A protein has these predicted regions:
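Non-transmembrane "mature" sequence context
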Residues: 1-123
Length: 123
């Protein structure tokens, strides 16, 4: 079962009127444009903003939202999580940030790193 703090953090990225994630909310909270968010998610900007592709967009944005929600939960602050995501190199990845890894399709590695930090592997 998901941690209640994680569920609350993740819910901040959704639409209030639909069960889908909101690209606009995610881009605002992360401080990036929709075009930059589309590149991070690996979809076109048109796909990101089109209503017909909501499920595809959810699938593309879910790893990013999981990362941001987890980082927010751990840092206690959504803004610090966004700054960490964009600017803090992750140990062992040659100076790459979480944003760099997500952009190259390695969101799962970032999630594994966050889980390791949560478990006390990295201090």
């Amino acid at each position: 079962m998901a941690n209640p703090a994680f569920v609350t953090a993740a819910s901040q990225f959704g639409n209030s009127d639909t069960p889908y994630l909101s690209p606009q909310r995610i881009s605002e909270r992360l401080g990036v444009t929709l075009t930059e968010l589309a590149k991070l998610a690996g979809v076109s900007r048109n796909t990101l903003t089109g209503k017909a592709s909501a499920r595809r967009v959810d699938a593309a944005l879910s790893p990013l939202v999981r990362i941001l929600a987890s980082a927010s939960e751990m840092s206690g602050d959504e803004r610090r999580a966004a700054i960490w995501f964009k600017h803090q190199p992750i140990p062992g990845w040659g100076g790459k940030t979480a944003q760099d890894l997500v952009r190259q399709g390695d969101a799962e590695k970032v999630l594994e790193y966050l889980e390791a930090v949560r478990s006390g592997v990295y201090a």
